[in-house]
A protein has these predicted regions:
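Functional cores that coordinate and move charged inorganic groups
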Residues: 1-95
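Accessory, non-catalytic peripheral segments of nucleic-acid enzymes
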Residues: 81-174
Length: 174
């Protein structure tokens, strides 16, 4: 776990210098599911996981390919592998935007999926935000809007909805 991570407990503490002192060319450190290259001489890599498992493992996932030439590591390459990409997506309602919630949500989902390849599917946890009055009006019919958003996203090929949460917009800092 090197110096640790905000998302994980320190479970195998060590430092890059400790690993470098061992004389190996490559260290593949496991358990942490996000890919990180910590050093290149020697290579110290947390290769990540080839597929996110839930919305708390967002973004593209990959495997690390090691290219060897003349018995030495010549290069590392990140190879995308995930067919499902989890993301948290915000659909912001405003009194100025007359579009219905499903259209606002679809725009947000399409923006989140814009960088995905044709073989990848977005699975989104949608947070509906906005002013309190607008949210309250939609929250009264939350079950309808959840179903409508999921149907609209599926019809448009914009991915799958894992969950829809209605929450107020963040309050301005005091």
């Amino acid at each position: 776990s090197l110096a640790g991570s905000a998302a994980h407990d320190v479970y195998a503490p060590c430092a890059v210098a400790d690993l470098a002192a061992r004389g190996y060319d490559y260290w593949a450190l496991g358990h942490v599911h996000g890919r990180t290259v910590h050093a290149e001489a020697p290579w110290v890599v947390m290769p990540g996981a080839p597929q996110g498992r839930h919305v708390n493992e967002p973004g593209p996932r990959s495997a690390t390919e090691i290219r060897v030439a003349d018995g030495r590591i010549a290069a590392l390459a990140e190879i995308p592998t995930a067919t499902v990409v989890f993301e948290r997506v915000e659909a912001r309602l405003s009194a100025e935007d007359a579009a219905p919630l499903d259209a606002v949500a679809l725009r947000a989902l399409e923006a989140a999926a814009a960088g995905l390849g044709p073989e990848q599917t977005l699975v989104a946890r949608l947070a509906v935000t906005g002013d309190a009055a607008t949210l309250a009006a939609h929250r009264r019919h939350a079950d309808y809007w959840r179903a409508r958003i999921a149907e609209t996203a599926a019809e448009a090929g914009a991915g799958w909805i894992e969950r829809v949460d209605f929450a107020p917009a963040a309050r301005p800092a005091a």
